[in-house]
Amino acid sequence: MTPKKEQYARKAEGWTDAEYADARAYLDHRAELIATLGAPLRAGEEVLDLACGDGGLADYLHGSEYLGVDASSEMVAAAQRRGRNVVLGDLNEYAPPQPVAATTCFRAIYYARDRRAFFERVAGYTEKKLVFDLNPRQYGVDDVRADLRAAGFDELVLRPFFSPQRHALPGPAASLLHGLERSGPLARLLLKARFSYLCAAFRGGRN
């Protein structure tokens, strides 16, 4: 086990609470956008969460069936102790037993050994959309869009995601930031300094 994996394993118990200053506000906003961005999800549809950690997102995807996958056995055990439906697997190799409506991958696209091949694999078992985050200061949007198109995802919706991970905000401040996600030029200006996009890739006209 590499030192990084050992550190990850040691933090498995209580991972979500330790990683977010306000886990409820952060994950609730993310779950809302997973359900509504791009092709909307209907009640009862299944969401596959790749590299899910302890599966904390499961508690906020109200109305959806949740399946989490993580490569750390310690994270999987921590998730299962909380009653979350999480199994062991590598995002580069895992395929669910049956197709899912949506797949999400949070802060983990960089774990893909080959990004285009990863998108192609996900497209093979995802019926509606792939939702993931993208740091525009680290990855070229046009390059990612090209890889998605090659995999069959011909539509891409990008939504600025202005929820701080390490800082808890009072309700009015959080609402203001969420409003700025739709502010166009101002949102793009903020993205030059920090934050990321939440992206929904899907097949146009077939969802």
Locate the predicted segments by residue.
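A short acidic, Gly/Pro-enriched loop at the edge of an enzyme's catalytic core
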Residues: 94-102
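Conserved beta-strand signature within the Rossmann-like core of class I S-adenosyl-L-methionine
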Residues: 127-136
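Short alpha-helix
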Residues: 138-152, 159
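Class I SAM-dependent methyltransferase SAM/SAH-binding core
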Residues: 53-93
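A C-terminal cap/extension of S-adenosyl-L-methionine-dependent methyltransferases
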Residues: 146, 162-207
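Conserved class I S-adenosyl-L-methionine
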Residues: 1-40, 44-53, 180
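A short SAM/SAH-binding and catalytic strip from SAM-dependent methyltransferases
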Residues: 102-114
